[in-house]
Amino acid sequence: MEAKGKVVGVIGNLVTIEMVGTVSMNEIVFIKTGGQSLKAEIIRIRDGEVDAQVFEMTRGIAVGDDVEFTDKLLTVELGPGLLSQVYDGLQNPLPELATKCGFFLERGLYLSALDRNKKWSFNATAKVGDFVVAGDFLGFVIEGTINHQIMVPFDRRDSYRIIEIVGDGDYTVDDKIAVIEDDAGGKHIITMSFHWPVKVPVTSYKKRLIPNETMVTQTRIIDTFFPVAKGGTFCIPGPFGAGKTVLQQVTSRNADVDIVIIAACGERAGEVVETLKEFPELTDPRTGKSLMERTCIICNTSSMPVAAREASVYTAITIGEYYRQMGLDILLLADSTSRWAQAMREMSGRLEEIPGDEAFPAYLESVIASFYERAGVVVLNNGSVGSVTVGGSVSPAGGNFEEPVTQATLKVVGAFHGLTRERSDARKFPAINPLDSWSKYRGVVEYEATEYARAFLVKGNEVNQMMRVVGEDGVSIDDFVVYLKSELLDSCYLQQNSFDSVDAAVSFERQNYMFNILYKILQSDFKFENKLEARSFINDLRQNILDMNLAPFKQEKFNKLEINLKNLLRSKKLDF
């Protein structure tokens, strides 16, 4: 029976609807008010009533307004044309909305996610008579720098036989590409695009693998000490202004992935505008073209409705899973998951649910876990491998890592890059605290060597704390040298200058080379007459290595500086 309903209550963006008929959880409904249709999602079903969260401002909605039930879940449209786009959480293209509305967006306006008129050059790879299942390739089109595979829609559950497929040529996303037939003789038309519900993980693959290949971000402290694997998960918690967004932008520019998806869910509008302005101007180091050609941005700022903020996270991960099905490596950056959790807290409060810690819903951990678990490495039906790596920034109030969102995130991620106010105030970029952070993945340098270096950082920090109490004269010269060595490692390796063309992105080979130099220095047993001599010598080493960091790898300037470094060390009778 077709459902019918009327509004009986409104609290903020939560609308209670009295209905007759059959409805399903997470079904999309449209509330008719003032000549507009406002999209909403059912989030609770009770006897004769449903509660729906509205994706727009609810001003003007009145008791008695009609409600139209669609019998569909919240979906995204998947097909060629997603890359280089900027969408809101409901996959409305923002540049087109701006053209249509100007500076202030109208309520109830929903546009097509893909360009219906653009023609794509289709190249068929399947042929009539082939048997296919969900996720199998029928052909491809060129989208930017990638081969965008046209696939059998993921909602097809059986095996099908291709009975018709078009020849190579130019087609729109709505044109018929193929016709497939099921076992019962039913025929199904395939176009270049299809819809998929955002809260349902894509499972059209053979099997999942354990992530073990390092995703090189070209940021030394991450790749060497706290690495991230392709298909893995990581989080970047830190106080406001510690550099979370900048670190994510640097990672998206330099990471060893095919496609970057940025979900700006609940960030300040100024930061989102900065991202939208910068990305088209950034040059992709891999292709020499604009970085936007392999980027998709989903943005819902903190000033947009709460429900759409939550939807943007799911929209982004679904688009990521779609491109993973093509055998590509995807990096999804969610900034910030704290705002998403706050949106859940707001809705939970309006639903009058029993609150958990700090009034967050009791199911916060399971929702966060279900999001991060959609990352992973998968083997596709044709044997190729694709991955989605998920990185979420967390903005705990006052930088308190004990709050519920950070703790729930730490339980499910494979790497933790904790930013601290102390390091960001000291102008250390990235402001990742090497003493608190950790990773379960394999990095570009041997684990034993990095643990040896980390032990130096821990010991150096202990000596530093001691010197703050008793002064420099209160520690032995051996302890003082340990402190100087830890500071050398920190300034020359853990910190990076993202404004310098050379130091901003450090290759896998260069990281190994420079770490080995510093590793040998840490192992060396220096003999000094006094602390003044020790400080002077280590400072000379530091300046030399910092200059090497800014010189192109293994070119004339770099080689000269390396000879200077060896001469410095030989002056202490060390064979280097």
Swiss-Prot record:
Gene Ontology terms: cellular component: proton-transporting ATP synthase complex
Binding-site residues, ATP: G238, P239, F240, G241, A242, G243, K244, T245
Family: Belongs to the ATPase alpha/beta chains family.
Alphabetical list of Pfam families matching this protein: ATP-synt_ab, ATP-synt_ab_N, ATP-synt_ab_Xtn, ATP-synt_VA_C
InterPro entries the UniProt entry points to: ATP-synt_VA_C, ATP-synth_a_Xtn, ATP_synth_asu-like_sf, ATPase_a/bsu_AS, ATPase_F1/V1/A1_a/bsu_N, ATPase_F1/V1/A1_a/bsu_N_sf, ATPase_F1/V1/A1_a/bsu_nucl-bd, ATPase_F1/V1_b/a_C
Any GO MF annotation of the entry: proton-transporting ATP synthase activity, rotational mechanism
This enzyme's EC code(s): 7.1.2.2
NCBIfam families: PRK04192.1 (NF003220)
Gene Ontology biological process terms in this record: proton motive force-driven plasma membrane ATP synthesis
SUPFAM superfamilies xrefs: C-terminal domain of alpha and beta subunits of F1 ATP synthase, N-terminal domain of alpha and beta subunits of F1 ATP synthase, P-loop containing nucleoside triphosphate hydrolases
Catalytic activity, reaction form: ATP + H2O + 4 H(+)(in) = ADP + phosphate + 5 H(+)(out)
The protein's name: V-type ATP synthase alpha chain
Keywords assigned: ATP synthesis, ATP-binding, Hydrogen ion transport, Ion transport, Nucleotide-binding, Translocase, Transport
Name of the coding gene: atpA
Function: Produces ATP from ADP in the presence of a proton gradient across the membrane. The V-type alpha chain is a catalytic subunit.
